[in-house]
UniProtKB/Swiss-Prot annotation:
Pfam families: PPE. It comes from the Bacteria. InterPro entries: PPE_dom, PPE_sf. The gene is PPE50. The lineage of its organism: Bacteria, Bacillati, Actinomycetota, Actinomycetes, Mycobacteriales. Belongs to the mycobacterial PPE family. This is Uncharacterized PPE family protein PPE50. Was identified as a high-confidence drug target. It comes from Mycobacterium tuberculosis (strain ATCC 25618 / H37Rv).
Length: 132
């Protein structure tokens, strides 16, 4: 949608009546928390498996457990990185909204300008044809 083709009253009203950036910032914080939990789980799980198979448990079962758990740890690490990226993108969306909001003329000012245009137009048409 090209907002440049919409009247300023519509763009201004939409920008000022919406929920604002807070929900995006809350979502970013939640994604950050999830990323931290996933990273912690990956680190702890990997550490426990490494200690268990390296010090207390030997043989084919140990080797098999280590091989089978590696993809899970990798998945946790990859998912933690992706959730961190999602948090970063949510913060970027909130920042973009804040910038757009700051650059948007408030609805009351748009209404005032429209009113002034109407008054000036009416005044100009009333004095049309009269000598200066």
């Amino acid at each position: 949608m090209d907002y440049a083709f919409l009247p300023p009253e519509i763009n201004s009203a939409r920008m000022y009546s919406g929920p604002g950036p807070n929900s995006m910032l809350v979502a970013a914080a939640s994604w950050d928390a999830l990323a931290a939990e996933l990273a912690s789980a990956a680190e702890n799980y990997g550490s426990v498996i490494a200690r268990l198979t390296g010090m207390h448990w030997w043989g084919p079962a140990s080797t098999s457990m280590l091989a089978m758990s590696a993809p899970y740890v990798e998945w946790l690490e990859r998912t933690a990185a992706q959730t961190k990226q999602t948090a970063t993108q949510a913060r970027a969306a909130a920042a973009a909204f804040e910038q757009a909001h700051a650059m948007t003329v408030p609805p009351a000012l748009v209404t005032g300008i429209r009113g002034a245009i109407v008054v000036e137009t009416a005044s100009a048409s009333n004095t049309a044809g009269t000598p200066p």
